[in-house]
Regions:
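Charged, compositionally biased, marginally structured helical/coil segments
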Residues: 1-155
Length: 155
């Protein structure tokens, strides 16, 4: 079953069970997909990879909003919890990301492969890691780890 078919089935089930949180998240994903599909110049196939990109972009926006609401304190707690639910719920359709330890190992391997040192090489290393492992790593985490590794004294 494709991701689109799963989303449609989940949407029907959420309607039947009157689960407003799931229903809102699924409708928003469909809306985001429709915006992308109707954009001028759109010509890619509407497949699982398309839906994963749409969901990933939406989840990224919701994570940022969740963090901003969480920083506002108790008044915005309900909104932050709602967004956290959406992020967790929609995450099941996204590829799994490597954890920090595995990402650090990749970063160290690329640094050794390129033979670079110093903070000025951070962009080159980050670009290489993302080029080779784009769907498996979190870009912000890679950037932080690259800067940490290049700033650390080399043995």
């Amino acid at each position: 079953m494709s991701i689109h078919e799963e989303l449609r089935a989940e949407l029907r089930e959420a309607m039947r069970s009157k689960d407003q949180r799931r229903l809102a998240a699924l409708r928003q994903v469909e809306s985001e997909a429709a915006v992308v599909k109707t954009a001028p110049g759109f010509s890619e196939p509407v497949d699982d990879a398309f839906y994963q990109r749409v969901i990933a972009a939406y989840v990224k926006k919701m994570q940022k909003a969740r963090d901003e609401y969480a920083a506002l304190g108790p008044r915005a707690q309900a909104m932050a919890e709602g967004l956290a639910f959406e992020v967790e719920y929609l995450g099941r359709w996204l590829p799994k990301k490597l954890d920090e330890a595995a990402t650090r190992a990749l970063v160290r391997g690329i640094i050794a492969e390129l033979g670079v040192t110093g903070a000025q090489a951070a962009g080159r290393v980050t670009g290489q890691v993302l080029k080779q492992h784009k769907d498996a790593v979190d870009g912000a985490l890679v950037n932080r780890l690259v800067r940490d590794e290049l700033a650390a004294p080399q043995p």
